Amino acid sequence: MDDEDFQKFKALIKENGLSPLEALKVIEGEQLLCNVLAEKVINEKVEKLKKKHKAKWPSPPVKWDTVPERWYLSMDDHSTESFAMKFPDAELVWVDLAQLHDKLANGSKRVKDPFSSNYKCKTARLVVHLDDGGEVSPPMIIHNKAGLHIVGGNHRFGWARHIAQPKIPVIICASQRTAIATLIDLDNSPT
């Protein structure tokens, strides 16, 4: 790091409150300053929310982002390309949330509420995002011999269940539509 970059580095820490690692990522062009600052604001909101009793949390509705080009966001570690390669026949359907929960395999069921210690951090981040007007991708479900499984979006599903959202969109593989439809009703629209 040359002297000019070092001065920028120090200024990012002093003037913007960045950690040394955050400042380094900005200097090296790995992240934009505006993104780092936005993430810091989100993290502060999350930490503040986690300290509140669950009765004091906001209960924002889930706004679903159903645009196919962003379905890959329903699962961790996927890009648009890798999602399309792994799930070339992905499609969106709407389901009754309670019916889906009843038919989930035991490993996919959330038996605790979204405020339990296992889920509280992710729930807080989700609630902050939704409360700020953000949208989220639908959960993805698959079928195998054990039943239905949520393979992406369990926290979003859990929050929708907590706020008693009656119907939710889910992503399925068209090749599994018939098998899934033997367990739950599938609709092509939210109404």
Question: Language model features by range: what are they?
Answer:
Residues 20, 58-61, 68, 88, ...:
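Proline-rich intrinsically disordered, low-complexity coils
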Residues 2, 26, 30-56, 85-151, ...:
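Short alpha-helix boundary/capping and kink motifs at helix termini
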Residues 1-78:
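N-terminal extension/subdomain marker
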Residues 78-79, 86:
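Membrane- and cytoskeleton-facing regulatory interfaces of eukaryotic small-GTPase pathways
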Residues 77-78, 97, 188:
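Short linear motifs in intrinsically disordered/low-complexity regions
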Residues 1-30, 38, 144-191:
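Basic- and aromatic-enriched surface patches that contact anionic nucleotides/nucleic acids
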